[in-house]
Structures are given as C-alpha cells and as structure tokens.
Amino acid sequence: MIKKENIFRIFLMFGFIVLTVFAVIRMRPVETGILSGFLNPQNELQKQLIELSAISSSTLNVIIESQYSENIENAKDELFNLLNKTNIKKDKFNSDRLLEIYSKYPNNFISYNRRQLLKNKNYKELSQISLEQLYNPLEFFIQTPDKDPYLFATDYVLNLQNPYFDTFNNTKEFNGKYYSKIFLKVTNPKTLNKDLKTLIKFQQKCNKKEDIKVYLTGTPIHTFVTSHKSSFEINIICIISFLSIMFICKKYFNSLKIFIPILLSISFGLIVGYLTTIVILGQMHVLTIVFATSLIGISLDYSFHYIISELKNINIIKSLTVSMLTTVVAFLLLLFSGVELLKQIGIYTASGLVGVYLFVILILPMLKNFYPKTTGDIKLPNISKYRNILVLVIVIVSIIGFCRIKTSDDIRTLYIPQKKLLQAEILNNKVFKMPEIMFITIKGNSVNKIIEQEELIGDKLNKDGVLYFSLAQFLPSAKRQMENRQMVKDLYQNNLYNYANFLDLGTKNSLKKASLKNDVQDFTKNNNDVLKNFMLDKNTSYMIVFGKYKPLTLGKNINQIKLADNISQIMKSIRIKFVKILPFIFLIYFILLSICYKPLKAVKIISAPLIASIFAIGFTSLIGQQIDIFHILSIFLILGFSLDYSIFMANGGKESKDAVFISFISTFISFTLLAFTSFKLISSMGIILAIGLLTSYLLGLAFFLKKE
C-alpha cells in the first residue's frame, strides 16, 4: 500500500511537470525595459512613454575630436566601414529621394517665413530675399532658377537643417578644435553587446593617437558599461555569499553534504515561482527576478529549520505552515495594486513560497542521507535586558530620520555615470549645446490628418521661434501643398514678370502655365523612409521640440511628453500606491496570525517587522538618501524575511535560534555586499535591506529569546 506522503510526492512531481509544459508553451523573452515594469501599456499615454523611451534608449552618439578636419573625415570613413559589419547604423534617412521630390515640385515646398510673406502678399520683400539668395556666390541650388525662380526648394532645404540632428552635416569648431557628431541607432538589441565592443575597440584605437580623440555618449553605452560592471560585482557577491553559506554549513553541521538539500530547496522554489509567473502572465520582468530573491532567504530559513528540527526531534510544521500562509496571502494582495511589476512579484513570491514549503515537508525527508549526525550550538548574547534601550534608540533614530525625510521620484537620480562617460556627456552639451527635449505625440485616422495637425502645431512653434523636428517639416500634407501652389500661382500672376528679369519670356510663360497644375505628392502611398522615423505606430506620430517651452494648448489625441518629468510623475503615483498598500499587508498579517495564535501574540510577532521597516526608512533618510520607489519596494523584501524570523522565534524559542541566525547571517552578508556596488540603485537597496534585516533580527532576539 502506497503511503500518504508518497501520494503527495507523486502529485507534486506531476504538478511540476504540467507547470513546466504550460510554461514552455507560454514562454516569452524576459522583459528588460525598466519602464515596462511600472507603466501600463493599455494606457495610451504610458504606452507612448514606453515607445519614446525605447527610441531614446536606442540612440548612440560618436563624437570625434581633432585639430584637423581631415583627420575627422578619415576617422569617420573608418567608423562607417566598421559599422557595416554591425547592427549599429547611421541614424539618417535617405535624403536623396527627398531632394529629388523637392526639386521636381518646388512650388509644393515652402518654408514658414516665405509662406508668411506669400500670405501677406508681401511680394516686394520676397523678391528682394530671393534675389539676394540667387546672386550669392556661395549659394547652392536644389533646383535651377529657370524652374524655381524664387528658390523655394533651396530655401526649404536650408530651413530643414537642425543644429541638434545630423540632417546634412554636424561638424563644429570649439576651443580651437573640430568636433564631428555622428548619430547612430541600435537596430538589433540582441547583438548590442558584441557591436558595442567593436565600437569601443575603435574608440580605444583612435585614442592612442595624439591628434584624435573619440567620445561615446547615449543610453546604450551607459547601459553597456554599467551592466558589465554591475554583473561582475554581483557575480563576486554571489560567490562570496555561496562560500559563506558553505562555511556556515561546515562550521555548524560539520558537513558540506547538508548544502545539497538546501540548494535543491532554493532551486525548486525559484523554478516554481518562475514557471507559475510564466504560465499566468506569459512573460517576466527582470526586476521581478531581482525582488523575488527573498525566496532564497526564506528557502534557507525553511530548510535550516526543518533539518535542525529533525535532528533535535522538534515539530515545527505549524510554524512553517503559518509562516507560509501569512506571507503568501500578503504577497497575493499585490495582485490588486494595478502595477505590473507588483503583480509579478506577488505571483512569483507566493507560488515560489508554496513550492519551497512543499519541497521541505515532502522531499527533504527523503534526503536524510545528507543530514549531519550532530549540530553545533551558537551562543548568542542575551540582549533582552537591553530591549528598552534598543527600542528607544530605534524610535529616536526613526523620528529624526522621518523629520528629515525627503522623497525623490526623478529617475535620473538612480544612476551616477562613470567619470569618462560623464565627461563625454558634458563635452556633448558644451560643444553641441544640447537643449531640453519635449515630445508631442499626435494620433489621427490617417498619416495625412496627422501631418495636418503637426503643421498647425509647427506654425505656433515657428511663430515663437522654437526649434522642432517633425514629419510635417519633410512631408507637408496635401492640404498644405495645395495652399502653397495656390499662393505661388497668385505670385506668378502678379509678380513673376517684373521679378524674373534673368529669364526669357517663354520660360516665364511656361512657369506660369505649370503653376496652374495641381501636382500634390501623397507620401503615404510611397511608403517613404521618412515615415518610419517619426511614427510610433500607423496612427501616431511624434514631434521633437527643443529647449524650455511652455505647454501648448493642444487638441484631443495630442500629448505633450517630457520623458523624465512624465515618468517621474508616474513613479510618484506608484510610490504613493505602494505606501498605501503596506498598511493592508500588515492588517492581513494581523488577522491571519490572530487566527493561528492569540491577538496579543500576533501583535508581538508583527511588531519586529513593522518597527524594522520604519527604522530602515528613517535610517536611510538620516544618512542623507532620498526615499524613492525602490526603497519602498525593499520594504516588501524586509517583510518577507523578518516575518519568518519573528514566527519561528516566537514559537521555537531557543530551539529556533540557530536556524534563524544561520538564515539571517547568510542573507545579511549578501545584502551588505550589495551596498558596496557601484550602481547607485543596487547599492541604495542593499543599504536599506541590510539595515532592515539587522534591526528585525535584533528585535526578534530582544522580544522572544529572553534566556540563553
């Protein structure tokens, strides 16, 4: 007859296999975009924020510096030959096709200033400007004067040049040196690391020469350098943490074999959490994996407690079950947060905890061959007599910290670039005078309608002398082209014969006759390359406005977006939402613990995690850090760990002290090491997590372990 435990084990393995199969079917690549974890793609504005951020994040700039322009041109040629072998391409559309259209239909393309002269029928001033341009020996012509006597096409192209984009040329002189800026675009993120290594080798090769220097700017290079350094640091931390756990196992159990079942329980919990999240949501965010590391600490906690209880013949199933249920219910509450990242963390952690719990009570008993015969005995100081002093210090520090508390939702404060990268960005701003950027998104039923809206906005910006970059500048709407042709028709009727003395009568007559035609260019039918540079989707375009500019009064389906400001506003609202969720989590803890134990004991168990969370925020504020969304998220991790400590200390007493200490010290070492990483986001989280765990553990000792 099959034992009841074996039946449960069979069901567990069968469920794991089914979960794996469904996960493989549903699996999509891990989401790495930070914003997509917080923003809702169903919200139109937030969807546009994600897309615009992705566009900005794919832009890479190469700045070449030299005293001689010839050296710069040679370096550019070498760079372009190198880029042909990569998926980093020059961010420039095919201008030859546009110039061909402009030259063929010059009457369709008229700059804002000349349109104003035509509208006001100020033909005298228009004639004067055109003649000055015509007889300028340095002038070039897009179309010859016999076909475009007022040089509309030439003037139109000249007005397309933008100092902030490489429309035609972007070389400047600064402090006695020449600087050329090449705009590049990442076309395939999968090969980005390989391609950037090629680009960095080119930079290093050029920088070895005396007469040339290359700088790299833009999000991709910052991400590459920071992620590589952070990965190296985190790998070192993982190795140290791994070795510390092995050392603890050897020291306490006098055996390394015990490490095998512990490692299996951790792995099982992490895998179950991952598979469940994939089955339910189809995809996982990289930040979910980071924040769900609480499973590792809890897995250690459960495993150590179970193994030590078996060796000491103590029954801790109730404590394990209560710990699992309270934590699972609390994390499931995150499903109602409305934030994608919190939903994923809730599902991952809750399902992973259930997986760890089932593995510990069903599978660990089968691995007794790996158990040691004896355990050590950890002597802990009796700090219960200092409980009042400890609480007083915590309260004072918390009060002072909260009095000085400052919040920050500016995503730019989460990252401090390395010195060389910072110098490159400063040089870029000094030489090329990079202004603030605002995006304007326009949604419409057709490309032509979208362009018409852009033209209305563009007229307002032109009137105020504001530089911008838009689809309508390159491809005017059919309506605007018809208006231009009508104004040129009136111009030729009233002014051509007096103005164009450099043309014979036959040419003038031909020009006048040609102006009667209604030749309008419909760019939507040609699938022009320019469209893809300005369209978020088939019904949405975006304009780029340069410099500080007051918000415009715009119509429906038009949004003004400043990436950093808009994202910061959303981060602020999410941070506030996180804070509002926390009291409900503590309430859930209290209700569940009151059911399992008495209300007074429930309060006592909750008090350590609650006080530790408050102290962690207060201490972080006291040392000068501004509280951001990631500090608040760290509180969820602190709760996951510290609640376990309290439950086991409250019910296991001295028998649980060793397991709790081993679990605590292993996790504390890992988070303390994180505090020394170079990436500010990770280091600030490491500080608050280490402080929160230490405080919670000390409070647990003071509240529950009165005698050694």
Q: What do these predicted ranges mean?
A:
Residues V24-Q67, Y164-T167, R404-K443, G640:
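Solvent-exposed, non-transmembrane loop/terminal regulatory segments of multi-pass membrane proteins
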Residues M1-N40, K190-T191, K197, Q204-D409, ...:
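Membrane-embedded transmembrane helical bundles of large multi-pass transporters/channels
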Residues P41, F93-L184, V225, L471-Y542:
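Extracytoplasmic
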Residues L12, F16, G33-F38, S53-F109:
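N-terminal pre-first-transmembrane
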Residues S510-Q560, A564-I570, K580, F584-L587, ...:
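Solvent-exposed soluble domains appended to multi-pass membrane proteins
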Residues Y68-K76, P189-K197, V447-E454:
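Solvent-exposed, non-transmembrane alpha-helical starts
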Residues L60-E65, L131, Y135, E139, ...:
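A short beta-strand structural signal in non-transmembrane regions
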Residues Q48, V391-D504:
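Juxtamembrane segments of multi-pass membrane proteins
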